[in-house]
Amino acid sequence: MAGPVRVNAHITGTVWKIEVKEGDEVAEGQVCVILESMKMEMPVEAPSAGRVEKVHVAEGQAVSEGDVLVTLA
């Protein structure tokens, strides 16, 4: 991997559940965070495999489209 990979929110909503923790190894396509918007749950997947370097959000936190949720190393 060339550098850190950001997992961004693709919608504005609320962090419903965080599926990973710092230090976890994730696969491409693995769900990292589940967002809730308009009573719908929307999974946010890792764009590539890597190790979770930082989780930038907490459950219940409001996020906007484009916000960084997780950074992979």
Mark where each language-model region is.
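Conserved beta-strand segments that form the floor/walls of ligand-binding pockets within enzyme
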Residues: 8-10, 19, 33, 56, ...
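Surface-exposed, flexible loop/turn segments at secondary-structure boundaries
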Residues: 23, 40, 60
